[in-house]
A protein has these predicted regions:
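Hydrophobic anchor at the beta1->P-loop junction of P-loop NTPases
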Residues: 6
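The conserved Walker
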Residues: 10
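Conserved lysine of the Walker
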Residues: 14
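Hydrophobic positions on the alpha1 helix immediately C-terminal to the Walker A/P-loop
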Residues: 17
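Conserved substrate/cofactor phosphate-moiety recognition/catalytic segment
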Residues: 22-66
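A basic- and aromatic-enriched beta-loop-alpha substructure that forms the phosphate/nucleotide-
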Residues: 66-104
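A glycine- and Lys/Arg-enriched "phosphate-lid" helix/loop adjacent to the NTP-binding pocket
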Residues: 88-162
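NTP-dependent small-molecule kinase module
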Residues: 138-194
Length: 194
């Protein structure tokens, strides 16, 4: 089984590109998908960056991936990954002043992240420039972030991928969904996975 994560900032097109890649792969392979876990979560948006919610999202992501892998698909496509959850935690931690337990909590989440990330065959980092994100966000009713937030988060993705040597490929999602999906398929072919 090859586990492929689609990661990136909100509004970048992860879910849409994943769906198209899933359609293409399913023509020849058994494919299962792990959906984005946030829409069905018990947390409001402003509560999502706390320790309890991050622990929930990280452990739920691991559990859902394990459950879906029991069906032994050839490809397991994940709408988001532990990379996304870990970076949400790091961003929130940078914005808040910590209490005495912050270091312990951070160490626990980091241990889960470091343990689980090698289970991904590769990560597709879906990217879009600020103007595209602003336009998509308005159309989709997504929360508008402070100026520079998307850029800072995108930079944090790049730094983390490089520092942790995560096998990742950037897909700039400015073109059609078909073209973005084809870029992903080319990378999978280059890796000799298809």
């Amino acid at each position: 089984m090859h586990k492929i994560a689609f990661s990136g900032i909100p509004g970048s097109g992860k879910t849409t590109v994943l769906a198209e890649v899933g359609k293409l792969l399913s023509l020849k392979y058994r494919v299962d998908e792990v959906p984005d876990l946030k829409p069905g979560s018990p947390f409001d948006y402003d509560q999502r960056a706390g320790f309890v919610s991050m622990f929930y999202f990280i452990t739920s992501q691991i559990n859902e991936e394990n459950i879906r892998s029991q069906g032994r698909p050839d490809f397991l496509l994940c709408d988001g990954s532990l990379l996304d959850r870990w970076l949400e935690w790091r961003s929130a931690k940078a914005e808040k002043s910590g209490n005495g337990q912050a270091a312990e909590r951070g160490a626990l989440l980091e241990s889960l992240y470091r343990f689980w990330m090698p289970s991904y065959t590769t990560v597709f980092r879906i990217r879009a420039d600020a103007m595209v994100l602003k336009e998509r966000g308005a159309k989709a009713g997504l929360q508008e972030f402070a100026p520079g937030h998307s850029r800072q988060t995108d930079e944090l993705y790049g730094q983390t991928i490089q520092q942790d040597r995560i096998p990742a490929f950037d897909i700039w999602n400015h073109q059609s969904i078909d073209e973005s999906a084809q870029v992903a398929m080319v990378h999978l072919a280059d890796m000799k996975l298809i």
